[in-house]
Amino acid sequence: TFSDPSALLYLSGNANVKIRLNGDATCNGFKTQSGQSVELDLNNHVLTLAKPTVGSAGTETNSCQLLKGSTVTMKNGTLASDNDKIMIQNYCNLTLDAMTVKGLNALYVLSNNCGNILISNTKINAGIGAYAFDVCGYSTYTDGVKVTVKGTSIINGNVELSKSTGNTEPMELNIEGGTFNGNLVVDSSITNASSIINVT
């Protein structure tokens, strides 16, 4: 367990790391790899993700990149970034619990291309006309993508459904609670949105 979030910059192997902030902090962009587990407890503080950003070679534009096979939980605080591209690029099993995620300059605050994603009692703030999150069946990822929104979550921004050409893996958007202040944008790549969206 660390109180310094810069520990996230040095993850290796099958790291199993807990971060618990003891004050507001700033950290460079970070990434997680397959087999790694990260629990980020902001403890009612603000973590600002700054430059340099991270990503795949040639596209290092994310404030964090969470790769397939990793497990990440963020809870109890505010995650912020001035990123003007994609703030959180997610391919992993991700839980956002009692969070505020602020990416007012980002095109996408949270882009989900793979994995199981739970947004619980969490506020996501996007800028005007931008995307709070998406559900994207991306490329050749074979695990599909499932996003569940529940509790008192507030989604300020658009939500997009899309998929890559040839991707036939399962996609789900399960809305079990929350307030949505934005448009649902269904890309032309989605031919049957009613098979993806479940409102209960």
PLM-predicted stretches and their roles:
Residues N112-I117, K123-F133, S139, N183-L184:
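Long amphipathic alpha-helical scaffold regions
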Residues L47, L79-N83, T100-G103, I119, ...:
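Beta-rich extracellular carbohydrate-active architectures
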Residues L40-L42, V72-N76, L94-A98, N116-N121, ...:
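All-beta strand scaffolds that present successive hydrophobic residues in beta-strands
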Residues T26-E39, L49-K75, A80-L94, N105-C114, ...:
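Extracellular beta-strand-rich solenoid/capping regions of secreted or surface-exposed proteins
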Residues N16, S37, N158:
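Exposed beta-strand and adjacent loop surfaces of beta-rich binding modules
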Residues I128, V159, S164-E172, E176-T179, ...:
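Extracellular parallel beta-helix/beta-solenoid repeat domains
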Residues T1-N22, T26-G29:
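Acidic Gly/Asp/Thr-rich repetitive segments characteristic of extracellular carbohydrate-active
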